[in-house]
Amino acid sequence: MLNTIVACLALNIYFEARDQPIDGQVAVTQVVINRVNDPRFSDNHCEVIKEGPVRNGLPIIGRCQFSWYCDGLKDVPKDQDAYRWAIMIATRVLDEGYEDFVDGSTHYHADHVSPAWSTEKTRVVKIGDHIFYRWEKKESKMIYREKNSEVMNRK
């Protein structure tokens, strides 16, 4: 049985980034974790992923933070190898920690779209076909270790 956090992160990796390079898949995971650590978002990984307006108990199509969650399709991975890979990435990121190479990014989008919010954020990096952004400039990198439930700033 999968840990709930790992399960949510793995689905997000699978549906948002399974066609991305490994560092792109980790970066998508980092965005969720950066949101969890940001007071503007929920401190719950699954709630961050599922954030968006609902109607009659269901997410409104096209209005979620992560598009796969409210696209109207079943959220069941078809490619089991890619899903197992996503589980492994989610587990490693949570268990082993990482240097935040998206530098605090809380947003990203595919490079073939230009959402209005992107002009109001600081562009950080492009990985694969995703462009990552953060709210504002910051000086420190963050290391996150789920196992110890701690966030350490490192300059």
Regions found by a protein language model. Give the residues of each.
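Bacterial extracytoplasmic/cell-wall-associated proteins, especially those involved in peptidoglycan
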Residues: 4-155
